[in-house]
Amino acid sequence: MHRQFFRLSASGLTPAAWEPPVDVFEDEREFIVVVALPGVPIERIEINYESDMLVVRADRGISFAGSSRTLHRLEIPYGAFERRIQVPNARLEAGTSEHVDGCLILRLRKTSRS
Protein backbone atom coordinates (compact mmCIF):
# COMPACT_ATOMS: atom_id res chain seq x y z
CA MET A 1 0.00 0.00 0.00
CA HIS A 2 2.92 2.35 0.76
CA ARG A 3 4.14 2.10 -2.85
CA GLN A 4 0.67 3.01 -4.07
CA PHE A 5 0.86 6.43 -2.40
CA PHE A 6 4.55 7.33 -2.62
CA ARG A 7 6.26 6.22 -5.82
CA LEU A 8 9.88 6.77 -6.73
CA SER A 9 10.11 9.49 -9.31
CA ALA A 10 10.55 8.56 -12.93
CA SER A 11 11.51 12.12 -13.84
CA GLY A 12 15.22 11.39 -13.63
CA LEU A 13 16.04 13.57 -10.63
CA THR A 14 17.96 11.34 -8.25
CA PRO A 15 17.44 7.81 -6.97
CA ALA A 16 16.19 9.31 -3.67
CA ALA A 17 13.51 11.43 -5.36
CA TRP A 18 9.89 10.63 -4.62
CA GLU A 19 6.52 11.85 -5.86
CA PRO A 20 3.66 12.80 -3.56
CA PRO A 21 0.19 11.79 -4.74
CA VAL A 22 -2.04 14.47 -6.28
CA ASP A 23 -5.70 14.99 -7.13
CA VAL A 24 -6.78 17.44 -9.84
CA PHE A 25 -10.32 18.79 -10.11
CA GLU A 26 -11.81 21.17 -12.68
CA ASP A 27 -14.96 23.21 -12.90
CA GLU A 28 -16.01 26.05 -15.21
CA ARG A 29 -13.94 28.64 -13.26
CA GLU A 30 -10.80 26.91 -12.01
CA PHE A 31 -8.52 23.93 -11.56
CA ILE A 32 -7.98 22.71 -8.01
CA VAL A 33 -4.81 20.72 -7.37
CA VAL A 34 -4.38 18.87 -4.07
CA VAL A 35 -0.88 17.59 -3.25
CA ALA A 36 -0.39 15.31 -0.21
CA LEU A 37 2.59 16.78 1.65
CA PRO A 38 2.37 15.82 5.33
CA GLY A 39 5.42 17.01 7.22
CA VAL A 40 6.44 19.63 4.65
CA PRO A 41 6.01 23.23 5.87
CA ILE A 42 4.47 25.54 3.26
CA GLU A 43 7.51 27.87 3.49
CA ARG A 44 9.68 25.09 2.03
CA ILE A 45 7.46 24.46 -1.00
CA GLU A 46 8.34 25.98 -4.38
CA ILE A 47 5.52 26.27 -6.95
CA ASN A 48 6.06 27.20 -10.61
CA TYR A 49 3.99 27.08 -13.78
CA GLU A 50 6.05 26.06 -16.83
CA SER A 51 4.24 25.78 -20.19
CA ASP A 52 1.32 23.48 -19.40
CA MET A 53 2.95 21.96 -16.31
CA LEU A 54 2.45 22.89 -12.68
CA VAL A 55 5.75 22.11 -10.92
CA VAL A 56 5.88 21.56 -7.15
CA ARG A 57 9.29 21.14 -5.47
CA ALA A 58 10.32 20.75 -1.86
CA ASP A 59 12.47 18.74 0.50
CA ARG A 60 11.07 16.80 3.43
CA GLY A 61 13.57 16.31 6.26
CA ILE A 62 13.56 13.61 8.90
CA SER A 63 12.30 15.40 11.99
CA PHE A 64 13.11 12.75 14.59
CA ALA A 65 16.61 11.82 13.44
CA GLY A 66 19.43 12.33 15.88
CA SER A 67 22.75 10.84 16.86
CA SER A 68 21.30 9.36 20.06
CA ARG A 69 18.40 7.59 18.31
CA THR A 70 18.38 4.18 16.70
CA LEU A 71 16.39 3.90 13.50
CA HIS A 72 14.28 0.73 13.39
CA ARG A 73 12.07 1.38 10.39
CA LEU A 74 11.96 4.10 7.72
CA GLU A 75 8.94 3.84 5.41
CA ILE A 76 7.95 7.50 5.01
CA PRO A 77 9.80 9.01 2.03
CA TYR A 78 12.20 11.85 2.83
CA GLY A 79 14.42 14.07 0.76
CA ALA A 80 13.93 16.24 -2.28
CA PHE A 81 11.12 15.81 -4.75
CA GLU A 82 9.78 17.45 -7.85
CA ARG A 83 6.22 16.73 -8.97
CA ARG A 84 5.15 17.82 -12.46
CA ILE A 85 1.41 17.98 -12.98
CA GLN A 86 0.11 18.51 -16.48
CA VAL A 87 -2.81 20.91 -16.58
CA PRO A 88 -4.99 20.66 -19.71
CA ASN A 89 -4.63 23.46 -22.23
CA ALA A 90 -6.22 26.46 -20.61
CA ARG A 91 -5.23 30.03 -19.86
CA LEU A 92 -4.63 30.11 -16.14
CA GLU A 93 -3.62 32.63 -13.52
CA ALA A 94 -2.50 32.08 -9.97
CA GLY A 95 -5.33 31.82 -7.52
CA THR A 96 -4.86 30.85 -3.90
CA SER A 97 -2.72 28.32 -2.09
CA GLU A 98 -3.27 26.91 1.35
CA HIS A 99 -1.87 24.12 3.49
CA VAL A 100 -4.67 22.12 5.14
CA ASP A 101 -4.28 18.85 7.08
CA GLY A 102 -0.95 18.06 5.43
CA CYS A 103 -2.18 18.85 1.91
CA LEU A 104 -1.19 21.72 -0.34
CA ILE A 105 -4.31 23.04 -2.09
CA LEU A 106 -3.72 25.18 -5.19
CA ARG A 107 -6.45 26.99 -7.08
CA LEU A 108 -5.67 28.09 -10.64
CA ARG A 109 -8.27 30.43 -12.12
CA LYS A 110 -9.23 30.09 -15.76
CA THR A 111 -9.00 33.32 -17.72
CA SER A 112 -9.93 34.35 -21.24
CA ARG A 113 -7.10 36.88 -21.53
CA SER A 114 -4.80 36.47 -24.52
List each language-model region with its residue ranges.
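Alpha-crystallin/small heat shock protein
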Residues: M1-S114
